[in-house]
């Protein structure tokens, strides 16, 4: 019987595969976020006309999902392997199935289903056509073709493939609890993450200072606006991410009512939309440097008319 891939070998295998498909291997972005989609390597690069192909691991924090390390599948923080390709290759689904084969999962021997599940992120004004990918009855991946990001229509279309690494590793290693996943030879997932899971859950549900978080949200929102007034897209987006994580902490703590919740989401969305518009304008001002010469000249000429 062949040795099962460790968690880090799964990551390395996916990195090698998508590198061979022309993706840049980016590193995780250093701000808290609820999903890999919120990284600027996806959110910002999915808009505008320039091509973009990237793959990266993104630790994703969802305070309300914390379970003190007691639930085998529900986590405060999990890991996503994110692939974004713009324009979307026509064979992206075939490439995805090929990536599973590299992980030792033969599509001909397993029940792999693409289940329609259109995607929406209200807090960033983003949406797209999507599918969940189910492997023998368990969701392991989300497929999305972005239609709108930051309130802007996308073009060319960006394809996003988001692997749930813990679920994928649980399946490959045949374990029932994420904490039993072998991260590296001789080191289990739980030995690294179960204590942080407990502590972050306790903080999110019991200890966090609600007044401080409320004040921080207002301060982060204001600072994002100040950065945008100066045309500073990336610092502004950092503060949008801080607003989002602060809201998630408030939500986990039960500190916002249903009505207030909608208001906070709208405030984050409004900032994200301004960031998106400012980013597109910035790339145009820079002359769309990632476009080939012919396409760039044509597009800039059209914009000048």
Swiss-Prot record:
EC category name: ligase
Keywords from the UniProt entry: Aminoacyl-tRNA synthetase, ATP-binding, Cytoplasm, Ligase, Nucleotide-binding, Protein biosynthesis
GO cellular component, one term: cytosol
Subcellular location: Cytoplasm
EC numbers for this chain: 6.1.1.14
GO biological process: glycyl-tRNA aminoacylation
Family: Belongs to the class-II aminoacyl-tRNA synthetase family.
The name this protein goes by in its record: Glycine--tRNA ligase alpha subunit
Origin species: Streptococcus pneumoniae (strain CGSP14)
Lineage of source species: Bacteria, Bacillati, Bacillota, Bacilli, Lactobacillales
Gene encoding the protein: glyQ
């Amino acid at each position: 019987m062949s040795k099962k891939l460790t968690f880090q070998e799964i990551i390395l295998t996916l990195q090698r595969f998508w590198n061979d498909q022309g993706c840049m291997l980016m590193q995780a972005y250093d701000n808290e976020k609820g999903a890999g989609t919120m990284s600027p390597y996806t959110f910002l690069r999915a808009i505008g006309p320039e091509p973009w192909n990237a793959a990266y691991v993104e630790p994703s924090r969802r305070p309300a999902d914390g379970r003190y390390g007691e639930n085998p599948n529900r986590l405060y923080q999990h890991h996503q392997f994110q692939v974004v390709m713009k324009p979307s290759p026509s064979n992206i689904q075939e490439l995805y199935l090929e990536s599973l084969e590299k992980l030792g999962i033969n599509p001909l021997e397993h029940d792999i289903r693409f289940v329609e599940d259109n995607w929406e992120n209200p807090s960033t004004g983003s949406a797209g056509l999507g599918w969940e990918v189910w492997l023998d009855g368990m969701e392991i991946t989300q497929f999305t073709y972005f239609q709108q990001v930051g309130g802007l229509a996308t073009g060319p279309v960006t394809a996003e493939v988001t692997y749930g690494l813990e679920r994928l590793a649980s399946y490959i290693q045949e374990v029932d609890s994420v904490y039993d996943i072998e991260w590296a030879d001789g080191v289990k997932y739980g030995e690294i993450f179960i204590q942080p899971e407990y502590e972050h859950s306790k903080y999110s549900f019991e200890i966090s200072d609600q007044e401080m978080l409320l004040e921080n949200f207002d301060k982060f929102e204001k600072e994002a606006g100040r950065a945008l007034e100066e045309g500073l897209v990336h610092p502004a987006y950092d503060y949008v991410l801080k607003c989002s994580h602060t809201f998630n902490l408030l939500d986990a703590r039960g500190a916002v009512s249903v009505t207030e919740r909608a208001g906070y989401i709208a405030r984050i969305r409004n900032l994200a939309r301004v960031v998106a518009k400012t980013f597109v304008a910035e790339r145009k001002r820079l002359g769309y440097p990632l476009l080939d010469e012919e396409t760039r000249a044509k597009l800039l000429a059209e914009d000048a008319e």
